[in-house]
Amino acid sequence: MGPGDLQDVLSGLKQQEHADLLVGLGRSDDAAVYRITDDVAIVSTVDFFPPIVDDPYLYGAIAAANSMSDVYAMGGQVLFALNVAGFPRDMPKDVIAAVFKGGADKVLEAGGVIAGGHTVVDAEPKYGLAVTGKVHPKRIFIKGGLRPGHRLFLSKPLGTGVVATAAKDDACEPAVLEGAVQSMLRLNRAAAEVARDAAVRGATDITGFGLLGHAAEMVDASGAGIALRLGDIPILPGALALAEKGTFSGGMKRNRTHLEHTLGARGRLSLGPSVGAAHAGLLFESETSGGLLFGVAPEDTRMVHDGFKRRGEACWEIGEVTAEIGIAIR
């Protein structure tokens, strides 16, 4: 569901107040957080979607990584997960088993366990997880935690959306698809660990609303602005070439329309002259199992770079937080 439609649907729902519900509907963050003790809070989230690759094992693993990402986006650690699935009646059992195996292996990699689940009959396959994690109540990452002067980091390249769209039409080179698959399989666990070490408070993960859509959520929640450097934003190999051919999903169009009617209508969305149609599309395009976007104080940037390097992971410093509300791409 696009961001505008989701806002309309949720507009009539009110936050149910509770002293221990630290993050709920009222904050519209990546996951719910409920305090258990002064030192432990539970992080809860759910996500599922139809297949984006042909291999059932990889589909299960990617869906699981995507589902667990919201726990990492809140600064949490994965504890356990429940399968959430729908499959056609005639789908071979070995295919379904492979989907579940892919999900279970990815949860195990995250340090968690599959504890159960629920399945229904559905015309189109769907799979994901309801994930439970934990976080210290005073160390929660939130979308509203950015402050002017913070440096912005992204932990994965953009481009999974255009690659997956091309793959559906058999219009994607195998090496390009493999690069996207490996990116989607990579957990945001290391990124969350580095961010915790750097005392991050403002973070989100880049998924269905795209980089600019999720950045806009942080702008609204933080009451600050975001300035991004186009040349520093990482893009998967082959993704820009696909974007130049106009290979975009319906999600990109919905995301762009929503932002142009919200931030854009208030003069708070600025795409500089260097941002061509292909790059703009990638910035608005939906991502699957995308990276963490987070802000750190300037004095902590070296800690972030060193932390990713020690873990053998890549990261990119792509911009900064400004006092002027809005998003600008230079």
Regions found by a protein language model. Name each.
Residues D20-V23, A31-Y34, S69-Y72, A104, ...:
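A generic local secondary-structure boundary/capping motif
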Residues A32-V43, L185-A191, L259-P273:
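Acidic-glycine-rich active-site phosphate/pyrophosphate-binding loop
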Residues I36-V53, Q77-C172, L211, E320:
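Glycine-rich anion-binding loops of enzyme active sites
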Residues P56-A81, K101-E109, R186-G202, I206-E217, ...:
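Small-aliphatic-rich amphipathic alpha-helix that forms the alpha element of a beta-alpha
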Residues R89-V113, V120-Y127, D197, T207-R330:
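Glycine-/charge-enriched secondary-structure boundary and capping motifs
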Residues A130-I140, P174-R196, V275-G276:
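Active-site glycine-rich loop that binds ribose-phosphate moieties when present
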Residues A164-A180, R311-A314:
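Short, compositionally biased
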